[in-house]
Amino acid sequence: MEDSFIHKGLRKKLIEKLVDRGIRDEKVLFAIDSVPRHLFMDKAFLKFAYVDKAFPIGDNQTISQPYTVAFQTQLLEIKKFDKVLEIGTGSGYQASVLHKMGADVYTIERHKKLYLRSKELLTKLNCKCMFIHADGYKGLPQFAPFDKIIITCGAPEIPNDLLLQLKIGG
């Protein structure tokens, strides 16, 4: 799992673009600069890892574009030790960014292949998250309440069960 000077340089350029687009939270920028996005992508797309676009990761899912990850993460206003529920692990990139910011991350993925791949990768990267293979629609009431909840997959509505698992003010 190489993270070369080229990758680091490309991340610096990506950070400049995110700042130009209005991302101001230094913790978000630091986390995105620290997490090697290319490790979360299919080998066919490696040379595009730091382009601000979404790319396929299998099971008809995508790794979100960096701006989307930065924008949503900035909206969360993460504080160290926040207990965060992520619905839709996907590649694991968003969970890794949240973990890098000091969040205690619980992440759910319904696609078995993506769940196994992201769990293996994040474990290798020493990203200590709670991984659950399930449909995120019901959330994780056994671990509630959560300071923050982020839905990173397509959802026609916010399930009421998730709202009930959010701390007041979360």
Could you say what each language-model-derived stretch is?
Residues 1-85, 93-97, 101, 114-117:
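Class I SAM-dependent transferase core
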Residues 77-169:
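Conserved nucleotide-cofactor-binding alpha/beta core module
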